[in-house]
Protein backbone atom coordinates (compact mmCIF):
# COMPACT_ATOMS: atom_id res chain seq x y z
CA UNK A 1 0.00 0.00 0.00
CA UNK A 2 3.04 2.26 -0.12
CA UNK A 3 2.01 3.65 -3.51
CA UNK A 4 -1.34 4.93 -2.24
CA UNK A 5 -1.81 8.71 -1.95
CA UNK A 6 -1.36 10.25 1.49
CA UNK A 7 -5.04 11.20 1.60
CA UNK A 8 -6.09 7.58 1.06
CA UNK A 9 -3.73 6.34 3.77
CA UNK A 10 -5.21 8.86 6.22
CA UNK A 11 -8.70 7.67 5.30
CA UNK A 12 -7.66 4.08 6.01
CA UNK A 13 -6.34 5.19 9.41
CA UNK A 14 -9.75 6.71 10.20
CA UNK A 15 -11.51 3.45 9.31
CA UNK A 16 -8.98 1.48 11.37
CA UNK A 17 -9.61 3.82 14.28
CA UNK A 18 -13.35 3.13 14.05
CA UNK A 19 -12.75 -0.62 14.01
CA UNK A 20 -10.58 -0.26 17.12
CA UNK A 21 -13.20 1.75 19.04
CA UNK A 22 -15.94 -0.74 18.25
CA UNK A 23 -13.90 -3.88 19.02
CA UNK A 24 -12.47 -2.43 22.24
CA UNK A 25 -15.94 -1.66 23.54
CA UNK A 26 -17.14 -5.23 23.00
CA UNK A 27 -14.66 -6.57 25.58
CA UNK A 28 -13.77 -3.70 27.91
CA UNK A 29 -17.19 -3.77 29.60
CA UNK A 30 -17.15 -7.47 30.57
CA UNK A 31 -14.53 -7.10 33.30
CA UNK A 32 -16.36 -4.14 34.85
CA UNK A 33 -19.79 -5.76 35.28
CA UNK A 34 -19.45 -6.79 38.96
CA UNK A 35 -18.21 -3.30 39.89
CA UNK A 36 -21.06 -1.72 37.92
CA UNK A 37 -23.56 -3.90 39.79
CA UNK A 38 -22.19 -2.80 43.16
CA UNK A 39 -22.14 0.88 42.15
CA UNK A 40 -25.68 0.85 40.76
CA UNK A 41 -27.08 -1.23 43.61
CA UNK A 42 -28.06 -4.09 41.32
CA UNK A 43 -27.63 -7.85 41.47
CA UNK A 44 -24.82 -9.15 39.22
CA UNK A 45 -27.48 -11.41 37.70
CA UNK A 46 -29.05 -8.40 35.98
CA UNK A 47 -25.85 -7.01 34.48
CA UNK A 48 -25.88 -9.26 31.42
CA UNK A 49 -28.40 -6.81 29.97
CA UNK A 50 -25.59 -4.23 29.70
CA UNK A 51 -24.06 -6.46 27.02
CA UNK A 52 -27.35 -7.61 25.51
CA UNK A 53 -28.67 -4.07 24.99
CA UNK A 54 -25.56 -3.19 22.95
CA UNK A 55 -25.21 -6.39 20.92
CA UNK A 56 -28.93 -6.70 20.18
CA UNK A 57 -29.07 -3.10 18.94
CA UNK A 58 -26.11 -3.82 16.66
CA UNK A 59 -27.93 -6.88 15.28
CA UNK A 60 -31.12 -4.90 14.64
CA UNK A 61 -29.40 -1.95 12.95
CA UNK A 62 -26.86 -3.84 10.81
CA UNK A 63 -29.18 -4.46 7.81
CA UNK A 64 -29.83 -0.72 7.42
CA UNK A 65 -26.23 0.50 7.69
CA UNK A 66 -25.02 -0.35 4.18
CA UNK A 67 -28.12 1.11 2.53
CA UNK A 68 -27.83 4.32 4.56
CA UNK A 69 -24.17 4.71 3.56
CA UNK A 70 -25.00 4.33 -0.13
CA UNK A 71 -27.96 6.70 0.13
CA UNK A 72 -26.57 9.46 2.38
CA UNK A 73 -22.83 9.01 1.81
CA UNK A 74 -20.11 7.09 3.62
CA UNK A 75 -18.61 10.19 5.25
CA UNK A 76 -21.94 11.39 6.63
CA UNK A 77 -22.87 7.98 8.02
CA UNK A 78 -19.38 7.23 9.42
CA UNK A 79 -19.36 10.66 11.11
CA UNK A 80 -22.84 10.02 12.51
CA UNK A 81 -21.74 6.59 13.75
CA UNK A 82 -18.77 8.04 15.65
CA UNK A 83 -20.90 10.85 17.13
CA UNK A 84 -23.62 8.45 18.30
CA UNK A 85 -21.05 6.06 19.73
CA UNK A 86 -19.31 8.90 21.58
CA UNK A 87 -22.57 10.36 22.91
CA UNK A 88 -23.62 6.89 24.02
CA UNK A 89 -20.31 6.56 25.88
CA UNK A 90 -20.90 9.87 27.64
CA UNK A 91 -24.43 8.90 28.68
CA UNK A 92 -23.14 5.51 29.90
CA UNK A 93 -20.64 7.26 32.18
CA UNK A 94 -23.36 9.59 33.50
CA UNK A 95 -25.87 6.80 34.16
CA UNK A 96 -27.12 6.56 37.72
CA UNK A 97 -29.42 3.57 37.26
CA UNK A 98 -29.32 0.33 35.31
CA UNK A 99 -32.17 1.43 33.02
CA UNK A 100 -30.32 4.62 32.11
CA UNK A 101 -27.21 2.57 31.36
CA UNK A 102 -29.16 0.18 29.13
CA UNK A 103 -30.60 3.06 27.08
CA UNK A 104 -27.15 4.60 26.70
CA UNK A 105 -25.71 1.25 25.60
CA UNK A 106 -28.44 0.96 22.99
CA UNK A 107 -27.41 4.37 21.62
CA UNK A 108 -23.82 3.12 21.51
CA UNK A 109 -25.06 0.08 19.61
CA UNK A 110 -26.63 2.23 16.89
CA UNK A 111 -23.25 3.86 16.29
CA UNK A 112 -21.37 0.57 16.50
CA UNK A 113 -23.72 -1.08 14.01
CA UNK A 114 -22.89 1.53 11.37
CA UNK A 115 -19.18 1.90 12.08
CA UNK A 116 -17.74 -1.43 10.89
CA UNK A 117 -19.84 -2.19 7.76
CA UNK A 118 -19.60 1.41 6.56
CA UNK A 119 -15.85 1.26 7.18
CA UNK A 120 -15.60 -1.83 4.96
CA UNK A 121 -17.64 -0.07 2.29
CA UNK A 122 -15.34 2.95 2.47
CA UNK A 123 -12.27 0.79 1.88
CA UNK A 124 -13.93 -0.76 -1.16
CA UNK A 125 -14.52 2.68 -2.65
CA UNK A 126 -11.15 4.34 -1.97
CA UNK A 127 -8.71 1.47 -2.66
CA UNK A 128 -8.02 -0.22 -6.03
CA UNK A 129 -9.45 -3.75 -6.19
CA UNK A 130 -6.02 -5.38 -6.40
CA UNK A 131 -5.04 -3.75 -3.09
CA UNK A 132 -8.31 -4.38 -1.28
CA UNK A 133 -7.11 -7.41 0.71
CA UNK A 134 -3.98 -5.60 1.91
CA UNK A 135 -6.06 -2.55 2.88
CA UNK A 136 -8.61 -4.65 4.78
CA UNK A 137 -5.81 -6.44 6.61
CA UNK A 138 -4.44 -3.04 7.65
CA UNK A 139 -7.74 -1.59 8.90
CA UNK A 140 -8.86 -4.77 10.72
CA UNK A 141 -5.59 -5.23 12.63
CA UNK A 142 -6.57 -2.62 15.27
CA UNK A 143 -9.88 -4.49 15.55
CA UNK A 144 -7.89 -7.54 16.64
CA UNK A 145 -5.86 -5.49 19.13
CA UNK A 146 -9.03 -4.09 20.74
CA UNK A 147 -10.22 -7.41 22.23
CA UNK A 148 -6.67 -8.03 23.47
CA UNK A 149 -6.47 -4.72 25.34
CA UNK A 150 -10.12 -4.51 26.40
CA UNK A 151 -10.33 -6.89 29.38
CA UNK A 152 -7.03 -5.80 30.96
CA UNK A 153 -7.68 -2.10 30.34
CA UNK A 154 -11.21 -2.42 31.71
CA UNK A 155 -9.94 -4.18 34.82
CA UNK A 156 -7.18 -1.59 35.30
CA UNK A 157 -9.60 1.35 35.04
CA UNK A 158 -12.13 -0.26 37.37
CA UNK A 159 -9.53 -1.17 40.00
CA UNK A 160 -7.61 2.11 40.07
CA UNK A 161 -10.26 4.63 38.96
CA UNK A 162 -13.93 3.67 38.48
CA UNK A 163 -16.07 1.85 35.93
CA UNK A 164 -17.17 5.19 34.46
CA UNK A 165 -13.74 5.57 32.84
CA UNK A 166 -14.24 2.62 30.52
CA UNK A 167 -16.73 4.88 28.74
CA UNK A 168 -15.10 8.27 29.34
CA UNK A 169 -11.93 7.24 27.46
CA UNK A 170 -14.04 7.02 24.28
CA UNK A 171 -14.97 10.71 24.36
CA UNK A 172 -11.68 12.45 23.38
CA UNK A 173 -10.92 9.67 20.92
CA UNK A 174 -14.38 10.00 19.40
CA UNK A 175 -14.09 13.78 19.06
CA UNK A 176 -10.77 13.46 17.23
CA UNK A 177 -12.19 10.73 14.98
CA UNK A 178 -15.29 12.76 14.12
CA UNK A 179 -13.24 15.85 13.18
CA UNK A 180 -10.84 13.75 11.09
CA UNK A 181 -13.77 12.12 9.29
CA UNK A 182 -15.25 15.48 8.29
CA UNK A 183 -11.89 16.82 7.13
CA UNK A 184 -10.41 13.82 5.33
CA UNK A 185 -13.02 11.28 4.27
CA UNK A 186 -14.80 11.62 0.89
CA UNK A 187 -18.58 11.36 0.85
CA UNK A 188 -19.18 8.62 -1.71
CA UNK A 189 -22.78 7.85 -2.61
CA UNK A 190 -24.34 5.49 -5.12
CA UNK A 191 -27.69 4.64 -6.62
CA UNK A 192 -29.68 2.47 -4.24
CA UNK A 193 -32.77 0.38 -4.56
CA UNK A 194 -35.74 1.07 -2.32
CA UNK A 195 -35.08 0.00 1.25
CA UNK A 196 -37.26 -2.86 2.53
CA UNK A 197 -38.60 -0.95 5.52
CA UNK A 198 -41.44 -3.41 6.15
CA UNK A 199 -39.05 -6.36 6.26
CA UNK A 200 -36.61 -4.44 8.45
CA UNK A 201 -39.29 -3.56 11.01
CA UNK A 202 -40.66 -7.11 11.11
CA UNK A 203 -37.21 -8.59 11.74
CA UNK A 204 -36.34 -5.91 14.30
CA UNK A 205 -39.54 -6.49 16.28
CA UNK A 206 -39.14 -10.27 16.10
CA UNK A 207 -35.53 -10.26 17.32
CA UNK A 208 -36.05 -7.70 20.06
CA UNK A 209 -39.20 -9.07 21.69
CA UNK A 210 -38.08 -12.71 21.57
CA UNK A 211 -34.80 -11.80 23.27
CA UNK A 212 -36.70 -9.88 25.95
CA UNK A 213 -39.06 -12.82 26.42
CA UNK A 214 -36.11 -15.20 26.77
CA UNK A 215 -34.74 -13.07 29.60
CA UNK A 216 -37.86 -14.06 31.50
CA UNK A 217 -39.34 -12.75 34.70
CA UNK A 218 -35.98 -13.06 36.53
CA UNK A 219 -34.35 -10.44 34.31
CA UNK A 220 -37.12 -8.20 33.01
CA UNK A 221 -39.65 -8.55 35.81
CA UNK A 222 -42.43 -9.30 33.31
CA UNK A 223 -45.33 -11.51 34.34
CA UNK A 224 -45.77 -14.94 32.68
CA UNK A 225 -48.70 -13.54 30.71
CA UNK A 226 -46.58 -10.64 29.42
CA UNK A 227 -43.79 -13.03 28.45
CA UNK A 228 -46.26 -15.22 26.56
CA UNK A 229 -47.49 -12.11 24.76
CA UNK A 230 -43.93 -11.16 23.79
CA UNK A 231 -43.29 -14.64 22.42
CA UNK A 232 -46.50 -14.48 20.38
CA UNK A 233 -45.62 -11.05 18.95
CA UNK A 234 -42.09 -12.19 18.09
CA UNK A 235 -43.19 -15.38 16.36
CA UNK A 236 -45.91 -13.57 14.41
CA UNK A 237 -43.41 -10.90 13.29
CA UNK A 238 -40.95 -13.52 11.99
CA UNK A 239 -43.69 -15.51 10.23
CA UNK A 240 -44.94 -12.31 8.60
CA UNK A 241 -41.40 -11.61 7.38
CA UNK A 242 -41.21 -15.06 5.76
CA UNK A 243 -44.51 -14.39 3.98
CA UNK A 244 -43.29 -10.91 3.03
CA UNK A 245 -40.02 -12.24 1.59
CA UNK A 246 -41.58 -14.95 -0.56
CA UNK A 247 -41.17 -14.11 -4.25
CA UNK A 248 -40.11 -10.58 -3.24
CA UNK A 249 -37.01 -9.43 -5.12
CA UNK A 250 -36.73 -6.37 -2.85
CA UNK A 251 -36.82 -8.31 0.42
CA UNK A 252 -34.19 -7.40 2.98
CA UNK A 253 -32.88 -10.99 2.87
CA UNK A 254 -33.95 -13.18 -0.03
CA UNK A 255 -35.24 -16.65 0.81
CA UNK A 256 -33.28 -17.89 -2.21
CA UNK A 257 -30.25 -17.88 0.09
CA UNK A 258 -31.51 -21.04 1.76
CA UNK A 259 -31.48 -23.01 -1.48
CA UNK A 260 -27.71 -23.32 -0.95
CA UNK A 261 -27.32 -26.21 1.49
CA UNK A 262 -23.98 -25.14 2.93
CA UNK A 263 -25.43 -21.69 3.64
CA UNK A 264 -28.43 -23.15 5.47
CA UNK A 265 -26.31 -25.54 7.52
CA UNK A 266 -23.63 -22.93 8.17
CA UNK A 267 -26.15 -20.30 9.25
CA UNK A 268 -27.99 -22.72 11.56
CA UNK A 269 -24.69 -23.90 13.02
CA UNK A 270 -23.41 -20.35 13.41
CA UNK A 271 -26.58 -19.32 15.22
CA UNK A 272 -26.52 -22.27 17.61
CA UNK A 273 -22.73 -22.22 17.97
CA UNK A 274 -22.46 -18.56 18.84
CA UNK A 275 -25.18 -18.86 21.45
CA UNK A 276 -22.87 -21.19 23.36
CA UNK A 277 -19.59 -19.41 22.72
CA UNK A 278 -21.25 -16.02 23.31
CA UNK A 279 -21.70 -16.97 26.96
CA UNK A 280 -17.96 -17.34 27.60
CA UNK A 281 -16.70 -13.71 27.34
CA UNK A 282 -19.48 -12.65 29.73
CA UNK A 283 -19.30 -15.53 32.19
CA UNK A 284 -15.52 -15.92 32.47
CA UNK A 285 -14.65 -12.53 34.08
CA UNK A 286 -17.82 -12.66 36.20
CA UNK A 287 -16.89 -16.13 37.48
CA UNK A 288 -13.28 -15.12 38.14
CA UNK A 289 -14.34 -12.10 40.20
CA UNK A 290 -17.52 -13.25 41.96
CA UNK A 291 -16.85 -16.98 42.09
CA UNK A 292 -13.10 -16.98 42.78
CA UNK A 293 -12.50 -13.53 44.26
CA UNK A 294 -10.10 -12.23 41.60
CA UNK A 295 -9.57 -8.46 41.36
CA UNK A 296 -10.94 -6.75 38.20
CA UNK A 297 -7.42 -6.20 36.84
CA UNK A 298 -6.37 -9.80 37.52
CA UNK A 299 -9.54 -11.08 35.86
CA UNK A 300 -8.86 -8.87 32.84
CA UNK A 301 -5.31 -10.17 32.51
CA UNK A 302 -6.61 -13.74 32.58
CA UNK A 303 -8.62 -13.03 29.40
CA UNK A 304 -5.53 -12.12 27.35
CA UNK A 305 -4.37 -15.74 26.72
CA UNK A 306 -7.77 -16.51 25.18
CA UNK A 307 -7.40 -13.65 22.69
CA UNK A 308 -3.80 -14.63 21.91
CA UNK A 309 -4.87 -18.20 21.21
CA UNK A 310 -7.60 -16.94 18.91
CA UNK A 311 -5.26 -14.65 16.97
CA UNK A 312 -2.54 -17.29 16.65
CA UNK A 313 -4.87 -19.97 15.29
CA UNK A 314 -6.10 -17.75 12.44
CA UNK A 315 -2.76 -18.28 10.68
CA UNK A 316 -3.25 -22.02 10.18
CA UNK A 317 -7.03 -22.54 10.19
CA UNK A 318 -7.20 -22.68 6.37
CA UNK A 319 -4.66 -25.51 6.25
CA UNK A 320 -6.53 -27.37 8.99
CA UNK A 321 -9.86 -27.15 7.14
CA UNK A 322 -8.30 -28.16 3.82
CA UNK A 323 -6.65 -31.15 5.50
CA UNK A 324 -9.61 -32.53 7.45
CA UNK A 325 -12.70 -30.97 5.83
CA UNK A 326 -15.42 -28.77 7.26
CA UNK A 327 -17.51 -31.49 8.89
CA UNK A 328 -14.69 -33.04 10.90
CA UNK A 329 -13.25 -29.68 11.94
CA UNK A 330 -16.59 -28.22 13.02
CA UNK A 331 -17.76 -31.30 14.93
CA UNK A 332 -14.36 -31.70 16.61
CA UNK A 333 -14.02 -28.03 17.60
CA UNK A 334 -17.60 -27.87 18.88
CA UNK A 335 -17.14 -30.89 21.13
CA UNK A 336 -13.63 -29.70 21.99
CA UNK A 337 -14.92 -26.31 23.13
CA UNK A 338 -17.44 -28.04 25.37
CA UNK A 339 -14.67 -30.14 26.93
CA UNK A 340 -12.41 -27.11 27.39
CA UNK A 341 -15.29 -25.33 29.13
CA UNK A 342 -15.55 -28.23 31.58
CA UNK A 343 -11.77 -28.23 32.00
CA UNK A 344 -11.80 -24.52 32.87
CA UNK A 345 -14.47 -25.00 35.51
CA UNK A 346 -12.69 -28.04 36.99
CA UNK A 347 -9.25 -26.43 37.25
CA UNK A 348 -10.75 -23.23 38.68
CA UNK A 349 -12.76 -25.00 41.38
CA UNK A 350 -9.74 -27.16 42.28
CA UNK A 351 -7.72 -24.00 42.82
CA UNK A 352 -5.19 -24.74 40.06
CA UNK A 353 -5.09 -21.09 39.03
CA UNK A 354 -1.68 -21.38 37.37
CA UNK A 355 -3.26 -23.74 34.80
CA UNK A 356 -6.08 -21.35 33.86
CA UNK A 357 -4.07 -19.23 31.35
CA UNK A 358 -3.18 -22.39 29.40
CA UNK A 359 -6.81 -23.55 29.42
CA UNK A 360 -8.00 -20.13 28.22
CA UNK A 361 -5.32 -20.11 25.49
CA UNK A 362 -6.61 -23.50 24.31
CA UNK A 363 -10.17 -22.20 24.45
CA UNK A 364 -9.21 -19.28 22.21
CA UNK A 365 -7.56 -21.61 19.68
CA UNK A 366 -10.57 -23.93 19.48
CA UNK A 367 -13.07 -21.08 19.32
CA UNK A 368 -11.15 -19.27 16.58
CA UNK A 369 -10.95 -22.40 14.44
CA UNK A 370 -14.67 -22.96 14.78
CA UNK A 371 -15.58 -19.32 14.04
CA UNK A 372 -13.45 -19.17 10.89
CA UNK A 373 -14.78 -22.52 9.66
CA UNK A 374 -18.40 -21.54 10.30
CA UNK A 375 -18.03 -18.24 8.46
CA UNK A 376 -16.41 -19.68 5.34
CA UNK A 377 -18.76 -22.68 5.20
CA UNK A 378 -21.77 -20.37 5.32
CA UNK A 379 -20.69 -18.05 2.51
CA UNK A 380 -18.40 -20.02 0.23
CA UNK A 381 -20.98 -21.60 -2.11
CA UNK A 382 -23.33 -18.62 -2.52
CA UNK A 383 -23.71 -17.27 -6.07
CA UNK A 384 -22.28 -13.81 -6.63
CA UNK A 385 -25.68 -12.10 -6.81
CA UNK A 386 -26.57 -13.36 -3.30
CA UNK A 387 -23.15 -13.05 -1.64
CA UNK A 388 -23.69 -9.54 -0.24
CA UNK A 389 -27.13 -10.37 1.15
CA UNK A 390 -25.83 -13.61 2.66
CA UNK A 391 -22.93 -11.82 4.32
CA UNK A 392 -25.28 -9.22 5.83
CA UNK A 393 -27.61 -11.92 7.16
CA UNK A 394 -24.67 -13.83 8.67
CA UNK A 395 -23.42 -10.64 10.37
CA UNK A 396 -26.86 -10.03 11.85
CA UNK A 397 -27.21 -13.63 13.04
CA UNK A 398 -23.75 -13.47 14.66
CA UNK A 399 -24.75 -10.48 16.78
CA UNK A 400 -28.22 -11.83 17.56
CA UNK A 401 -26.93 -15.22 18.71
CA UNK A 402 -24.30 -13.57 20.93
CA UNK A 403 -27.00 -11.49 22.63
CA UNK A 404 -29.12 -14.62 23.13
CA UNK A 405 -26.10 -16.45 24.55
CA UNK A 406 -25.45 -13.75 27.13
CA UNK A 407 -29.16 -13.69 27.98
CA UNK A 408 -29.21 -17.47 28.53
CA UNK A 409 -26.08 -17.26 30.70
CA UNK A 410 -27.78 -14.67 32.90
CA UNK A 411 -30.92 -16.81 32.96
CA UNK A 412 -28.92 -19.87 34.09
CA UNK A 413 -27.33 -17.91 36.92
CA UNK A 414 -30.80 -16.80 37.97
CA UNK A 415 -32.15 -20.35 37.89
CA UNK A 416 -29.35 -21.88 39.95
CA UNK A 417 -28.71 -18.99 42.33
CA UNK A 418 -30.52 -16.40 44.37
CA UNK A 419 -30.92 -12.79 43.29
CA UNK A 420 -27.74 -11.83 45.14
CA UNK A 421 -24.68 -13.81 44.12
CA UNK A 422 -21.52 -12.55 45.83
CA UNK A 423 -18.05 -13.67 46.83
CA UNK A 424 -19.20 -13.96 50.44
CA UNK A 425 -21.97 -16.42 49.62
CA UNK A 426 -21.15 -20.02 50.54
CA UNK A 427 -23.19 -21.40 47.65
CA UNK A 428 -21.74 -19.15 44.95
CA UNK A 429 -19.24 -21.68 43.58
CA UNK A 430 -21.96 -24.34 43.46
CA UNK A 431 -24.17 -21.97 41.48
CA UNK A 432 -21.39 -21.31 39.01
CA UNK A 433 -20.58 -25.04 38.75
CA UNK A 434 -24.12 -25.89 37.66
CA UNK A 435 -24.13 -22.91 35.31
CA UNK A 436 -20.88 -24.01 33.62
CA UNK A 437 -22.11 -27.60 33.29
CA UNK A 438 -25.23 -26.30 31.54
CA UNK A 439 -23.12 -24.07 29.31
CA UNK A 440 -20.91 -27.02 28.30
CA UNK A 441 -24.03 -28.96 27.29
CA UNK A 442 -25.40 -26.05 25.24
CA UNK A 443 -22.01 -25.52 23.55
CA UNK A 444 -21.94 -29.18 22.43
CA UNK A 445 -25.41 -29.17 20.81
CA UNK A 446 -24.43 -27.60 17.43
CA UNK A 447 -22.33 -30.71 16.72
CA UNK A 448 -25.59 -32.34 15.56
CA UNK A 449 -25.99 -29.59 12.95
CA UNK A 450 -22.39 -29.76 11.75
CA UNK A 451 -22.59 -33.56 11.47
CA UNK A 452 -24.97 -33.00 8.53
CA UNK A 453 -22.36 -31.08 6.52
CA UNK A 454 -21.39 -33.21 3.47
CA UNK A 455 -18.12 -35.03 4.08
CA UNK A 456 -16.71 -33.84 0.73
CA UNK A 457 -17.22 -30.15 1.57
CA UNK A 458 -13.74 -28.66 1.19
CA UNK A 459 -12.58 -25.22 0.16
CA UNK A 460 -11.80 -26.41 -3.37
CA UNK A 461 -15.50 -27.14 -3.90
CA UNK A 462 -16.21 -23.41 -3.87
CA UNK A 463 -13.36 -22.76 -6.32
CA UNK A 464 -14.59 -25.31 -8.81
CA UNK A 465 -18.15 -23.99 -8.53
CA UNK A 466 -17.06 -20.47 -9.43
CA UNK A 467 -15.08 -21.79 -12.36
CA UNK A 468 -18.16 -23.56 -13.68
CA UNK A 469 -20.30 -20.48 -13.24
CA UNK A 470 -17.79 -18.40 -15.15
CA UNK A 471 -17.95 -20.67 -18.20
Curated annotation (Swiss-Prot):
GO terms for cellular component: plasma membrane. The keyword Chloroplast does not apply. The keyword Transport applies. It comes from the Bacteria. Its main location: membrane. One of its GO terms (molecular function) is transmembrane transporter activity. Keywords: Cell inner membrane, Cell membrane, Membrane, Transmembrane, Transmembrane helix, Transport. It is found in: Cell inner membrane. PANTHER family: BLR6921 PROTEIN, MAJOR FACILITATOR SUPERFAMILY MULTIDRUG TRANSPORTER MFSC. NCBIfam families: efflux_EmrB, PRK10504.1. This is Putative multidrug resistance protein MdtD.
Amino acid sequence: MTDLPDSTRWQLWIVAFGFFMQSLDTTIVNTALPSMAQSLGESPLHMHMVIVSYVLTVAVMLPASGWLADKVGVRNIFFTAIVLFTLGSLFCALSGTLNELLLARALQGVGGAMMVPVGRLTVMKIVPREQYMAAMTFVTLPGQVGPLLGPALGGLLVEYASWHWIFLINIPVGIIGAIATLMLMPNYTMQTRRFDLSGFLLLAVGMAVLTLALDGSKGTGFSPLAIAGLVAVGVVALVLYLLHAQNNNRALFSLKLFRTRTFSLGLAGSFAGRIGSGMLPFMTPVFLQIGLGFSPFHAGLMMIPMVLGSMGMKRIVVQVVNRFGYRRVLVATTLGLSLVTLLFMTTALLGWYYVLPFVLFLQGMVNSTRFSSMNTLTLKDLPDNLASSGNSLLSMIMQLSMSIGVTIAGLLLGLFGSQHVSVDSGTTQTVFMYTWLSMAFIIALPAFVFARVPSDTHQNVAISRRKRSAQ
